[in-house]
């Protein structure tokens, strides 16, 4: 599995050229993309500016010598490469397993090009086998949790290693929704967008046109 992740990370790095502002995703697969960019910066004199999507990715990029800027310091991002937790047949996706969904969606929104890199196990006909993360402000979060219970979304709190409610980089909580089959991802996204106290959710609908997939038959690119 790790070899597959590395393959797509290296493949995605081929789309990066000198002079680009590059969005650096978060997660185990995106880490291989960042690692390959670091190698190219050191060995090939690749000149880029990275915009990171989490504190974890920032630390990795700094250690690799990749110059960084915040999303507010650039006009736009040329290309963002990130992983995904589940992707349906229409290239809608669920992200946020690494608790970085808010920053990931902000960087993706201001990117000219956006690519996901995954192994074939992340592909599904319909979304729902992976939980839907919902980032919420701490105040009133228990009320939101009850709302999700009433909607039969089987909510659970995202916890840290100490068993306490996880605090995101943006100082929010995450409530994970466990919905067996999401028939209409956009309808669910619209519903969540209208809920007071919800900061962002992990449904990334219609945001990517290209997915790089590694599987038993090699690396392929799926385009929409």
Swiss-Prot record:
Keyword Transcription regulation: no
Keywords (A to Z) from UniProt: Isomerase
Molecular function GO labels: ribose-5-phosphate isomerase activity
Reaction(s) this enzyme catalyzes, per UniProt: aldehydo-D-ribose 5-phosphate = D-ribulose 5-phosphate
PANTHER family on file: RIBOSE-5-PHOSPHATE ISOMERASE 3, CHLOROPLASTIC-RELATED
Family: Belongs to the ribose 5-phosphate isomerase family.
Name of this protein: Ribose-5-phosphate isomerase A
Organism: Lactococcus lactis subsp. cremoris (strain MG1363)
The encoding gene: rpiA
